[in-house]
């Protein structure tokens, strides 16, 4: 009878221990489920972060499109400036040709003026010589005087033509100076446009490089999310298996916690790097 009591007490004690172990196992299973739910929440948070990154990438692509549009506008402005410069060059060439013709006419007028002056001088010398000789031939004197008048008229006409040519030459020179100033202004404008176009090209290249790096980081991030999702599914399977083997579950959950901490740190590092990249892109 005593042996039966001892056996019953032992069985009761074993029953109590079994109940305690079962309660501990249930508690560990609940903890594992909580950890699994927390992992799911973190995955959802990662998915939201990915969506945010995709939105920011769309903004970067819009900025790239705007930069391309601005570059096309600069190219059109450069083409317009080149057309203006070509027109100025043609205008300068016409002015130079007109100047050459004016100079040629001036040479002719100057030669005629010299010829008229020589004729006037010759007539004056002849008149003085006739006066000294006391020539009384009035008709001859009249003729000489008429020749003198004609010579003087020719000289005056040559003077007027010379003044007109000089005035036109001054106007042509003024037009030429203004055309040269416009040409210099056009060349300065071209230099400014070329410099601005070079700066835009450099910024565009930097933006394309930054976008390529962001794309590479995004792909790496997506790969990391897929890995984490697979590991989460594996953790859920292990949580189900933990209901049948509490001791194995505890070890697996501890390992998952360490791995999750490591993934959080890695994700934080990736997020910081992406934030820095987008900050640089926004700065451009």
UniProtKB/Swiss-Prot annotation:
Keywords: Allergen, Coiled coil, Muscle protein, Repeat. InterPro entries: Tropomyosin. Residues 1-273 form a coiled coil. One of its GO terms (molecular function) is protein homodimerization activity. Ubiquitous, but especially prevalent in the anterior muscle bundles associated with legs. Expression in the mid and posterior regions is probably related to the numerous, small muscle bundles associated with the digestive and reproductive systems (at protein level). Tropomyosin, in association with the troponin complex, plays a central role in the calcium dependent regulation of muscle contraction. The molecule is in a coiled coil structure that is formed by 2 polypeptide chains. The sequence exhibits a prominent seven-residues periodicity. This is Tropomyosin.
């Amino acid at each position: 009878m005593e042996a039966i009591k001892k056996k019953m007490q032992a069985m009761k004690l074993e029953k109590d221990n079994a109940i305690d172990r079962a309660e501990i196992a249930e508690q560990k299973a609940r903890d594992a489920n909580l950890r699994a739910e927390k992992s799911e929440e973190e995955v959802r948070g990662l998915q939201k972060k990915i969506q945010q990154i995709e939105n920011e990438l769309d903004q970067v692509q819009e900025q790239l499109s705007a930069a391309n549009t601005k570059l096309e506008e600069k190219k059109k402005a450069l083409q317009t400036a080149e057309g203006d410069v070509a027109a100025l060059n043609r205008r300068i060439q016409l002015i130079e040709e007109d100047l050459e013709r004016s100079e040629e006419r001036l040479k002719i007028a100057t030669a005629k003026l010299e010829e008229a002056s020589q004729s006037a001088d010759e007539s004056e010398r002849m008149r003085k010589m006739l006066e000294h000789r006391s020539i009384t031939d009035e008709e001859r004197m009249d003729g000489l005087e008429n020749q003198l008048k004609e010579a003087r008229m020719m000289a005056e006409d040559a003077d007027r033509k010379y003044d007109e040519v000089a005035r036109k030459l001054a106007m042509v020179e003024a037009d030429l100076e203004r055309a040269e100033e416009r040409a210099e202004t056009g060349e300065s404008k071209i230099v400014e446009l070329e410099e601005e176009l070079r700066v835009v090209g450099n910024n565009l290249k930097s933006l394309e490089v930054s976008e390529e790096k962001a794309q590479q980081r995004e792909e790496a991030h997506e790969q990391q999310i897929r890995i984490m999702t697979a590991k989460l599914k594996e953790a859920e399977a292990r949580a189900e298996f933990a209901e049948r083997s509490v001791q194995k579950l505890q070890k697996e959950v501890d390992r998952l916690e360490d791995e999750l901490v490591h993934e959080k740190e890695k994700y934080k590092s990736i997020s910081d790097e992406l934030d820095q990249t987008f900050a640089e892109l926004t700065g451009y």
